[in-house]
């Protein structure tokens, strides 16, 4: 069996080598010719799996080691009888930890504020639920908005109420362009007008959920602290926007070693179910041990003293800013940052909590 895999996927050889010949390719530039005689295709969100890519191929299975599916033309896949799978929730823990890290980097005093600090979470799916848990461990008040999900552990509010009440807003929705609750440009001029000027905004979901032109106008007006891991016109990012952001990172919020490995395992399991193979491999056997920071220690004390050692978000911010050339970060530089990213470990690997 020929298997084509994005070169940036983790542990593909470990999980898939026994099934056939694996060809590693750059996901963003994958062509019909690359996959024409492949039976399985393993991708990330940078690959648009659409009619032009999959028509007249030998493909029987497409696995995307990602939370989202907006890069998959599911209608086309089903038309051609191609089984597909994604990895919903694979890196949810890493994204939740990213948000906590970003907030504490911007204001370490949040560790002491307890319920004086209100975190508003837009989207209460896999990531949102884990972020609720982690934020409540720190004593923060959490409010949430999701038209499809209500959580008993928090105050569920309207979108407008969340914008008006939260001290920080973190976005965790898929990108959708149709329907009553479409998320494309959910954060537009009207939404920014409702936000309090000193409310922190974090987007680690999908870039086009935030209308970039409206965001730039808002920051110019309010000097708001904004953290972006995703960008509307990604992978090209303007220097103008970068210079306005409190923190910027190259779409790596979910890039923990555990998250990447978990994503590959999930599409491996779906692959085995499709082709009738026994599921007998676990990613945990491939992970190295790392230093225990948390066991026997107070959570807040550890975060106060060791946060930058667990995850140095300032370095990621510096790295993307160093890639600016002629007024922007270009695709090649952006993709290299992601390809060469030194995968961090989740808190649990250091003996810490996990939602």
Swiss-Prot record:
It is found in: Cytoplasm. The keyword Chloroplast does not apply. GO terms for molecular function: 4-phosphoerythronate dehydrogenase activity; NAD binding; protein dimerization activity. Disulfide bonds: none annotated. NAD(+) binds at residues 146, 229, 254. Its EC number is 1.1.1.290. The keyword NAD applies. Pfam families: 2-Hacid_dh (PF00389), 2-Hacid_dh_C (PF02826), DUF3410 (PF11890). GO terms for cellular component: cytosol. It is an enzyme of class 1 (oxidoreductase). It comes from the Bacteria. Keywords: Cytoplasm, NAD, Oxidoreductase, Pyridoxine biosynthesis. Its main location: cytoplasm. Pathway: Cofactor biosynthesis; pyridoxine 5'-phosphate biosynthesis; pyridoxine 5'-phosphate from D-erythrose 4-phosphate: step 2/5. It catalyses: 4-phospho-D-erythronate + NAD(+) = (R)-3-hydroxy-2-oxo-4-phosphooxybutanoate + NADH + H(+). The active site is at residues 206, 234, 251. GO terms for biological process: 'de novo' pyridoxal 5'-phosphate biosynthetic process; pyridoxine biosynthetic process. Substrate binds at residues 45, 66, 255. InterPro entries: D-isomer_2_OHA_DH_cat_dom, D-isomer_DH_CS1, D-isomer_DH_NAD-bd, Erythronate-4-P_DHase, Erythronate-4-P_DHase_dimer, NAD(P)-bd_dom_sf, PdxB_dimer_sf. Homodimer. Belongs to the D-isomer specific 2-hydroxyacid dehydrogenase family. PdxB subfamily. Catalyzes the oxidation of erythronate-4-phosphate to 3-hydroxy-2-oxo-4-phosphonooxybutanoate. This is Erythronate-4-phosphate dehydrogenase. It comes from Acinetobacter baumannii (strain AYE). The gene is pdxB.
């Amino acid at each position: 069996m020929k298997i084509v895999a994005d070169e940036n996927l983790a542990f593909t050889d470990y999980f898939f080598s026994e099934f056939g010949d694996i060809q590693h390719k750059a996901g963003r530039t994958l062509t019909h010719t690359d996959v024409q005689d492949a039976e399985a295709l393993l991708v990330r969100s940078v690959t648009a799996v659409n009619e032009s890519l999959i028509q007249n191929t030998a493909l029987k299975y497409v696995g995307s080691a990602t939370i989202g599916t907006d890069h998959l033309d599911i209608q086309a896949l089903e038309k051609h009888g191609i089984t597909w799978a994604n990895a919903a929730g694979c890196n949810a823990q890493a994204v939740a930890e990213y948000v906590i890290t970003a907030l504490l980097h911007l204001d370490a005093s949040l560790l002491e504020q307890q319920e004086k600090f209100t975190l508003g979470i837009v989207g209460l799916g896999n990531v949102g639920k884990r972020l609720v848990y982690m934020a409540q461990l720190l004593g923060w008040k959490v409010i949430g908005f999701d038209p499809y999900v209500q959580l008993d552990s928090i105050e569920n509010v309207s979108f407008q109420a969340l914008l008006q009440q939260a001290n920080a807003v973190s976005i965790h929705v898929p990108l959708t362009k149709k329907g009553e609750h479409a998320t494309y440009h959910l954060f537009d001029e009207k939404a920014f007008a409702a936000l309090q000027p000193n409310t922190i905004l974090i987007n680690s979901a999908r870039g086009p959920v935030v209308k970039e032109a409206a965001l730039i106008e808002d920051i110019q007006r309010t000097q708001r602290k904004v953290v972006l891991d995703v960008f509307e016109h990604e992978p090209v990012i303007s220097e103008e926007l970068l210079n306005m952001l409190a923190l910027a990172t190259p779409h790596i919020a979910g890039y923990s070693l555990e998250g990447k490995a978990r994503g590959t395992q999930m599409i491996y399991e779906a692959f085995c179910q499709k082709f009738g193979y026994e599921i007998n491999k676990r990613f945990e056997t491939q992970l190295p041990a790392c230093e225990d920071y948390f066991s026997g220690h107070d959570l807040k004390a550890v975060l106060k003293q060791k946060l930058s050692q667990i995850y140095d978000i300032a370095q990621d911010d510096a790295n993307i800013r160093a890639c600016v050339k002629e007024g922007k970060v270009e695709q090649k530089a952006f993709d290299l940052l992601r390809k060469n990213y030194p995968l961090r470990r989740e808190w649990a690997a250091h003996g810490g909590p996990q939602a």
